């Protein structure tokens, strides 16, 4: 996560110095500085300082320094210098990511916090996810892209520390917010009789996620440095024990912010999916049961798509880092710069997809986006959209520490005392939770001429949580 462009800049300096035979000391100095960087580009940097004057600088991405006047014209060619049209296309691509991610996630935050109906446990974690994604897009994506294009750090020493520190923090907060949602869905569906997280407990979990994220990213902040070179300023991370320590740290980061949480979410959503889509529950089912089951499926389906999107977007970036660290000759490949820009763009684009997914798969978020863009002549907000965020479809009542949705049916019973024995023997046994025919809808027959069907959703939970 630390500065890719800084390593490339050192490569550029080393290659330019090596190309000028009169400045061997500068080449050695550049190579030593590159070694201090401790990035995955270390071997390339050392090699660049010892290249012959006939080999151009193998920098995967940035404009190079001007060669010495005495350098032969044939040596000026650099395969990594991009044409203007390509820079314009990359700028447009990164600009779209920043715009959609920032404004889309801010609207998601507004939809949840401004409407009481949307303030559920799951949605509080979605607020945290949206905040971390919007922050990543606003404070990291564009700055890193500018640095990669210009090979110069314009933003000062303090922002250099922030730039190397915050991306890991934001990604950690994002993926563990998704993990918390997965665990919450698991508890609500697999063990619904246990109390759900309260608003206070949810805030504590969110705070704990950010504290752990800060601790994981702290070394990046402590070891960040800026260095003023002739004509440019660099931002990089200098690890005390060199590149090996850097590589180990990033492997740990990949495990903690990618492999481990995806494993947890894969297990939980697999179990939840088998439960929700495994087959029809035997016995008669009431309408409310079917409706709540359908709502639960929609929420789980949406979150699975969010997780899969995140995994796909970040996988090429992690593969790129590991391969270029192990097989350093890849850094000389003609198209390595484009591969990096594409993998980094795909990773950063993960911040913009979630608002689109929410809008497409959840009618309340869709109604909220319509309200946010009601000023647009192509967007029409219906009365249904207005009511969707303001009213509740069900009015749960608190009974024995449980929220229930109850449907009452009345019937008339003619009772003949002479048939009492036959009535007792033919009376249907009431289904219980241990009965395989029990499906959440209980039916009670009695002499009092009333039949009650009730569905117990989960403790402290209403249908609002799943709609």
Curated annotation (Swiss-Prot):
Gene Ontology molecular function: tachykinin receptor activity
Q: List the disulfide bonds.
A: 160-235
Query: Which region is the signal sequence?
Result: none
Residue intervals on the Extracellular side: 1-86, 142-161, 225-247, 324-336
- Tell me the compartments it is located in: Cell membrane
Record flagged with keyword Nucleotide-binding: no
Indicate which residues are glycosylated according to the record. Answer: 23, 50, 75
Query: What cellular component GO annotations does this protein have?
Result: plasma membrane; sperm midpiece
Lipid modification (S-palmitoyl cysteine) maps to 376
In this UniProt entry, which residues form the Cytoplasmic topological domain(s)?
A: 110-119, 184-203, 273-301, 362-467
Which Pfam family, an example, fits this chain? 7tm_1
Topology in the lipid bilayer is annotated as:
Multi-pass membrane protein
Record-level GO BP terms? positive regulation of flagellated sperm motility
Q: Where is this region: Disordered?
A: 416-467
Q: Any idea what job this protein has?
A: This is a receptor for the tachykinin neuropeptide neuromedin-K (neurokinin B). It is associated with G proteins that activate a phosphatidylinositol-calcium second messenger system.
Q: Which PANTHER family match?
A: G-PROTEIN COUPLED RECEPTOR TKR-1-RELATED, NEUROMEDIN-K RECEPTOR
Question: Per the similarity annotation, which family is this?
Answer: Belongs to the G-protein coupled receptor 1 family.
Q: How is this protein named in the record?
A: Neuromedin-K receptor
* Gene name linked to the record: TACR3
